[in-house]
Amino acid sequence: MSKDKVLTAPGATIGIPRSQRHYGMDWLRIAAFGLLIVYHVAMVFAPWAWVIKTSHAYPQLIAPMALLTPWRLPLLFAVSGYASRKLFDRAGGAAVFARSRAVRLLVPLGFGMAAVVPVEMWVRVMETGYPHGYLHFWALDYWRVGSFYGREFPSWEHLWFVAYLAAYSLLLAAALAWRGAQIIEMLGRAAEWLGQGPRLLWVPLVALVTARLALLFVAPERQGLVSDWGGHSQYVPLFLFGFALAGAPRLWPAIARSWKPALGVVALAGVVIVAIELRYPGTAVPPHALMALDRAARVAMAWGMILALFHIAETWWNRDHDWRKPLAEAVFPFYIVHHPAIVLIAWYSLPLDLPPFAEFALLLGGTALVCSAVYLVGRRIGWLRPLIGLASKPVAIAPAAAQGGAAFERDGEVAALVGLDAAHRGAADDAAAMDPREARA
């Protein structure tokens, strides 16, 4: 019998060994991040507000990008929750889990705000008339607090996702330290109940839509850890769903039953979203009834896509490959660097007035090259590894998890960071990138 500890949710039919890794979730993260880079490069050309724009907007991008926007971030928080449960099970307690999350999330966040985000903020203020070079900006102006050349300082820009994930993880760790057994049991029973019949598709969908609409005209739609109640009303439940799923294997058959009707929901919601987006493009604000319909459709699409993509990850992608581990490890460094890379390359290349396909290829290829260089160099420098989200050294493993668990401990924490979008609204500030209906970035 394996020495691995087996964690079983109430009502589960099989146990989950602590060393077990879901390769499908890794591939899902990797694919989502690849999509993220393409999406953010396309934002330079889309007719929506963003950090830096080409002089020629392309309305043809509205429909495909409108179909991507609603589900990228929710997917990432759900996958993050799943990976966080695996890490918690291996940590041996809430305190170790909290310490691990703080180091692996807050250190890169601090480094990113000090050394990576300033590049993007310099381009932002240059766009509004700032007269000095980057070194002058970083040394004398970046550290101010308040409004400066129309931008708010300080800012974590695209790293807002890391801040949110750190907050959710540390709050969850505190709750688990307080009532861990009760919370795990409650999540397990909720998962067991949702796994019956068609509940998994419809109950969360109705709950998420209700929460979103309840806050729509009450809380402003804006990025901010203490003000983004609309975002938290979606991200927190999905993070907890992923956390529960990792300990409740009985949910996987329910996902398998739900994915086809979920795609039907996605298709219907997509028609609504695109129709409203085309009718009220850019900063145009639709009537309240249509705005509520748009928000409900976005939430429905997000939940449907999560179920469908989780089924794909479980059924077709849950297998290992030589490329999986290096790609999964590269996710977080790529996430930290990719956004400022796009902005800086665009800042210097747009005046060349290249043909659109050449410009797109330059932005995409240049961003991939910069991210790859940072990852390949940074992973070889010991003191730089934790700053770009990599483990400084292999994590010590509890005896109960020693057999078979080492592979997860070395690269599993990077997986929980979901450094992809992973999608996100934070790439632009509240004024420049926030559409009245939803952030685009």
What residue ranges belong to the model's regions?
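Alpha-helical transmembrane segments and their immediate juxtamembrane cytosolic regions
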Residues: S2-G419, H424, A433-A441
